[in-house]
């Protein structure tokens, strides 16, 4: 009995329509630290979508919110987005190993094809 109710509830939730959370964009600078990450992502996506339109038709509050998210303490210029030398070095080494291995495999494959053709000519 408990399993059927759980399945019904799950189906009911999966068939329901999505309702985005209502957040006042006018207070985005104060509300931003308290918002859940999912809500933050939705606000960012909404503002990106709005900024694709003609900016003359976008309300001033939304323009200010987009500016805050782009240039404020939470955007790409935040302290958490500083360049990390160790991480960058490890990414370079990883990519060199990855693409070096792929290049070596491709070179060996070409050499094997040439060797195979030479062996066919001998027979």
UniProtKB/Swiss-Prot annotation:
Organism: Saccharomyces cerevisiae (strain ATCC 204508 / S288c)
Major place of residence: mitochondrion
Protein name (database record): Maintenance of telomere capping protein 3, mitochondrial
Interval spanned by the transit peptide: 1-37
Organism taxonomic ancestry: Eukaryota, Fungi, Dikarya, Ascomycota, Saccharomycotina
SUPFAM superfamilies associated with the record: Mitochondrial cytochrome c oxidase subunit IV (SSF81406)
Highest rank taxon of the organism: Eukaryota
Role noted for this protein: May be involved in telomere capping.
Keywords attached to this entry: Mitochondrion, Transit peptide
Pfam families cross-referenced by the UniProt entry: COX4
């Amino acid at each position: 009995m408990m399993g059927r109710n759980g399945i019904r509830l799950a189906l009911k939730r999966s068939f329901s329509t999505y309702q985005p959370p209502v957040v006042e964009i006018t207070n985005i600078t104060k509300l931003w630290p308290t918002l859940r990450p999912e809500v933050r992502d939705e606000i960012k996506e909404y503002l990106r979508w709005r900024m694709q339109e003609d900016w003359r038709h976008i309300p001033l509050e939304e323009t200010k919110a987009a500016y805050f998210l782009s240039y404020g303490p939470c955007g790409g210029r935040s302290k958490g987005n500083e360049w990390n030398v160790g991480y960058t070095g490890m990414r370079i080494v990883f990519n060199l190993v990855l693409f070096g291995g792929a290049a070596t495999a491709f070179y060996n494959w070409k050499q094997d094809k040439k060797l195979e053709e030479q062996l066919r000519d001998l027979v």
